[in-house]
Amino acid sequence: MRMLRWLILSAFSVAGAVQAQGNQDSAAASASSASIGAPVLRTSPGLRVHRLPDEKIPAFMEADQISGDPDSEVTLTGNAQVRRVDGIIKGDRINYRRDTGDVDVQGSARMLRDGTLITGPSARLNVDTYSGEIQEPNFWIGASGGTAQARHADIFSKSQMRLSQVTYSGCPCPKPSWYIKADTVDLDFDENEGVARNGVLYFKDVPILASPYLTFPVKKERKSGFLMPTYGTTSNSGFDISLPYYFNLAPNYDLTLVPRYLSKRGAQLGGEFRYLGSGYRGVAIGTYLPDDNETGRDRWMYRTYHRQLLGNGFYTDWDIAGASDDNYFRDISELGLNTASTTYLPRRGRVGWSSTYWQTYAQVYKYQTLQDPDAPLAPPYDKVPELWLKGARYDWGGFDAEWVSTAVRFQRPLLNGRRLGPDGDRLQTYPTVSYPIVRPGWFLVPKVGVHYTQYRTDWYNRDWNRIGLSNYKRTESRTVPIMSLDAGMIFERDASLFGKAATQTLEPRLYYLRVPYRDQSALPVYDTTLADFSFDQAFQENIYTGGWDRIANANQLTAALTTRWLDANTGFERLSLSAAQRIYFQDQEVTLPAEQPRKNVRSDFLVGATAALTDTLTTDVAAQYNPYDNKWSRGMVSARWSPQRLTTVAVAYRYQRDPLPGISYQPQGQNQVSLAVQWPIHRRWYGVGRVDYSLRSEPATAAAAEQSPRVTQAIAGLEYKGDCCWVGRVVYQRYAVSAADTNTALFFQLELTGLGALGTDPISLLNRSIPGYQSVVPPTPTGTTFERYE
C-alpha cells in the first residue's frame, strides 16, 4: 500500500528545501565569481532563504509495501526507496527509523548523492549525518566518471569516506586498461582529494608505478599535488626528467614548482605563479640551474606579465623577461617547445588611459638581445621613455578625424663596446581627416593629413647616414603633407564553379597617393625599415614601416583587381583570385642609409589565389614578380588535404630572392620546402611528421654563407590508440638552434584517459607544426552531478 499523505506532504516540503538549497548555492557561486571579476547573477534582496538542518529535511518514501509507525520506524518492502533532497537510497528491503535517521538496507542497495552512485548487497546508513558502512561496494563517481570496487566502505559524512582493499579506475570501459590498487583510499569530496595508501598503478595488468602514498582529485577540478612526471632526451642536455608539484592556493591564483634534472647539466628548479582578480591578471615564471656542468656557471631565466585596470579609464601593464646568457634557450629549451629561436626578450612597463575619443600611454621599452655568435645582430633601440597619444572621432558629420602624437627618447645598447648609431629624442604628430563615402556596390575615401617630426640627436661625430657629412645638425624638423584617394567597386553575378551554383564578384580598386619630397638624408633612423611589398602594403601611405623616420615621396597609383566565387547556398568562399601593381609617376628620392633608390615606373606584380577545390582540399598561392628582369622576387605555394579525421597532408614552398651584395635593409633570401603529415598507418597506428628543408645554395651575401642546403627542422613520430582509455606516443625532433648548430630531442608519452599522461606532452609541438593536426583522443566532456538521475 502507498502512503498518499506522506507523498503530498513530502512533495511540498522538498520543493521548499530545493529552493532554499539552490538560493544558498547561487549566492556562494556569485561571491566566488565576483572575486575574479566575472559577470554574476545575484539573489534578489526580496527573497528569504531558509536553510533546514539535516535532521529536519523531509523524506519521501515509496515501496510495493509499507508498514510500521510513520512517526518512528517504517519498513519498506519491494522496490523500496527513500528520497531526500540531498540523496536517494534504494533496496529490496529498507528499515527506516525517522526519529534517528538510521537506515538498514538489505538486498541490492543503491545510494545516489551529488552524482555519485554506490551499490552493494547491503548497507547501514544514517541519512541525517550521512554516516554508515557498506559491504563490497561498487562506486560510480559522476563528477569524474571514475569507478571503484572495494571490500568494505566506511562513510563518515556527506563528503568523507574510507574504502578498504580498493581497485579504482577512471576508464569507463568494461575491462579498464589501467587501474589503481590500494590497501585503503580516503575520499574527501569537499577538499577534492583522494589519498591512496600502498597504491600501485597497473597498465594492462602490469604494475608500472608504486607509492606508499598517492593523492589524486576526485572531481574534475584543480587540486594541489604532484602532476605526472615528464621525461625525454635532448642532445644538448641529455636525459631530461621533471616532477611538477601543483599548489591550488585559491580559486584565483596558483603555483607550480618544477624540479628538473638534466643529465648533462645538473638539477634545475622552475616555477610558475598565476593570478587573476577583479580588474587584474598576471603570470610569473622562472628557472634556476646552479653551476651548469657544461658551462660551469649559473643559468637562469625569468618572465613576468601583469595587466591591471586602475579605474576611470586608467590601466597599467608590464612584460619583463631576462636570461643569464645568450645561449640559455639554445642549451636549455623546454621539451617539445622550440624556444631556441628566441632572440629578443622584452623589458616593458606601461601606464595608460583610455576614453571614448582619446587614448594615451607612457612606457619604457627595452630589450635583452640574445646573440648568435655565428650570426650577430645589432640590438634594437631602447625607448626610454615613450609617450603616445591618439584621438579619434568617426562619422563626425560624415568625417573621420584622427590625431596621433608620440615623443620618444632613443638609446641604443653597445655591441661589444662599440656604438652602433646615434641617440636622441623624436617628437611626431600626425593629424588626418577623411570623408568616407560608402554606398552599395562602391566606395570613395579621400584623406588628407600633415606629418610633423622634430629631432634632437646626439650624433657622436660620426657619419651614420653615409652622406659625407662630418657635422650633422643637433636639431632638425620635417613637415610632410600626405594626400590619398581610395576608391573601389563591387560587381556581382550568378555563375557556376565546378558545376555548382555560385555568386561571382568582381572588385576593382584604385588607390592614389601624393606625398611631396622632403630632404631627410640628415635625419637619424631609429626604428624604421623598408616594408615588404604586399597586398596590404600596396594601399599604405609609406613604403617604410615602424616609426616613420623616413616618409617616401610619392606620386603613384595602385591598381588592384579581385574576383571571388562564393557558394550560392552558404556564402562560403570557394575561389579567390587577386592581382595588383603600383604605377609610379615620380622617381624615389627618399631612402634609408645605403638604400638604392627605385628608378622603375612600375612596381612588381602581386598575384594571389586561394581555393577550396573540395571540402577536403585547400590551396593558397601568393607571389611577387619583377617585370623588368622577369624573375620572381618572392613566392609561396601551399596545399592541404584532409580527407577524413586524423588524416592530413600539408605541403608548402616558400621563396624569397636574396638582396644584392651590400644591401642590409632587405631580409635575407629564403628557398624552403615543407611537408607535414598525419596519416593512419594500420588500424590503431598513426604516423606524424614534418620536414623543413632549405634549398639555398651559392648565397649572394656573406651573411648567408652558412645557409647551405640543410634540414632546418625534422619531426617524426608514431601514435598508437589503445583499445580503451590509453594512447602511446613517441616523437623525434631535430631543429636548428643557430646558423650552424642543431639540437635533437626524443620524448615518449603514455596518456591514460581519466588519469593523466606519463612523459612529455608533444601535442603543442604537433599542433604548431602540422596544419590540421587532430588528437587521436577526442576531448572528453566534463561530467556533472546531473550525469545520472534516478
From Swiss-Prot:
Predominant localisation class: membrane
Keyword tRNA-binding: no
Signal peptide interval: 1-20
InterPro entries the UniProt entry points to: LipoPS_assembly_LptD (IPR020889), LptD (IPR050218), LptD_2 (IPR045659), LptD_C (IPR007543)
GO annotation, biological process: Gram-negative-bacterium-type cell outer membrane assembly; lipopolysaccharide transport
UniProt KW keywords: Cell outer membrane, Membrane, Signal
One Pfam match: LptD_2
Superkingdom field: Bacteria
Compartments, as annotated in UniProt: Cell outer membrane
Family: Belongs to the LptD family.
Function of the molecule: Together with LptE, is involved in the assembly of lipopolysaccharide (LPS) at the surface of the outer membrane.
Official protein name in the record: LPS-assembly protein LptD
Annotated source species: Bordetella parapertussis (strain 12822 / ATCC BAA-587 / NCTC 13253)
Phylogenetic placement of the source organism: Bacteria, Pseudomonadati, Pseudomonadota, Betaproteobacteria, Burkholderiales
Gene (UniProt): lptD
